UniProtKB/Swiss-Prot annotation:
Transmembrane domains' residue ranges: none
Family of this protein: Belongs to the class IV-like SAM-binding methyltransferase superfamily. RNA methyltransferase TrmH family. TrmL subfamily.
Name of protein: tRNA (cytidine(34)-2'-O)-methyltransferase
Source organism phylogeny: Bacteria, Pseudomonadati, Pseudomonadota, Betaproteobacteria, Burkholderiales
EC number(s) stated in the UniProt entry for this protein: 2.1.1.207
Length: 156
């Protein structure tokens, strides 16, 4: 299945929504510290309802600890960013891919984004005068498109 990586998320309900999404799609969730809230935050738990127990989630102290623990294939990692040049609809996603998202207010740090080749810095299409999409909405669009490409493997 797919892997969702949130780097330093700040808004508890967004993370709660992503937990619920991962529970319902089978995607694995990785949270990279620092987090902008405690994991027992009531707003996050409310947004995730009772799906926390069904989601596969791991917390990593920083990016390097994440890479060491998970050993993701760099060729199958995609950084989603408003500064991306790769076109979302040009990618053929595969089960096991890693989708990396930055925080709600800052996005991915430049030093992290630079580790991704240009074609793996992906931007979702949107109206030209708008800043960005909501983090949890963006994650949902990406995961469902990837899952669709995989034939909704494991879905009912």
């Amino acid at each position: 299945m797919f892997n969702v990586v949130l780097v330093a998320p700040e808004i508890p309900p967004n993370t709660g929504n992503v937990i619920r999404l991962c529970a319902n799609t089978g995607a694995h969730l990785h949270l990279i510290e620092p987090l902008g809230f405690p994991l027992d935050d009531a707003r996050m738990r409310r947004a995730g309802l009772d799906y926390h127990e069904y989601a596969q989630m791991r917390v990593h102290r920083d990016w390097d600890a994440f890479v060491a623990a998970e050993t993701p294939d760099p060729a199958r990692m995609f950084a989603f960013t408003t500064r991306g040049s790769g076109r979302f609809h040009d990618h053929a996603f595969l089960s096991g891919d890693w989708f990396v998202f930055g925080s709600e207010t800052r996005g991915l740090p430049a030093e992290l984004l630079e580790r991704f080749p240009n074609e793996q810095r992906v931007r979702l299409p949107m109206r030209p005068d708008n800043r960005s999409l909501n983090l949890s909405n963006t994650v949902a669009v990406v995961v469902f498109e990837a899952w669709r490409q995989a034939g909704f493997e494991g879905g009912a």
